[in-house]
């Protein structure tokens, strides 16, 4: 899986969960028929949002994105559907080209983030476990902090 494929899949997943959450919000606040859509898709969207943000940082390290581009990629997860726009914008500028430069036989890592990435690329099963644990831990923190907006209605 290339940086482009990883990033695109999560950008599309993030936009899709936005659509599902917005549908749930219409059902809850517009038609007042059910809160189930917000309860289910809110959680799903939160998990995918976190995964997208982690993947953005992971790809940014590999692609040597500037802080500005990385921040734009992260902020694109906030407005609905902007992750897909950012994905296309980054691809048009060749910001998602190539493979994993720090994979075995590739460049030697120089910074701490690059060393972490090289370790993860050399151990994909362990990396997947670390990624899942990171998403779970950040989701737990988000649940403890509470929803981004008041849930009273």
Task: Enumerate the predicted regions with their spans.
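Individual transmembrane alpha-helices with interfacial aromatic-anchor signatures
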Residues: 115-136
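Membrane-helix exit/interface motif
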Residues: 20-33, 52-61
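Loop-to-helix transition at the N-terminal end of transmembrane alpha-helices
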Residues: 34-49, 153
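Juxtamembrane boundary at the C-terminal end of a transmembrane helix
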Residues: 137-153
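Core segments of transmembrane alpha-helices
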Residues: 11-21, 49-52, 128-135
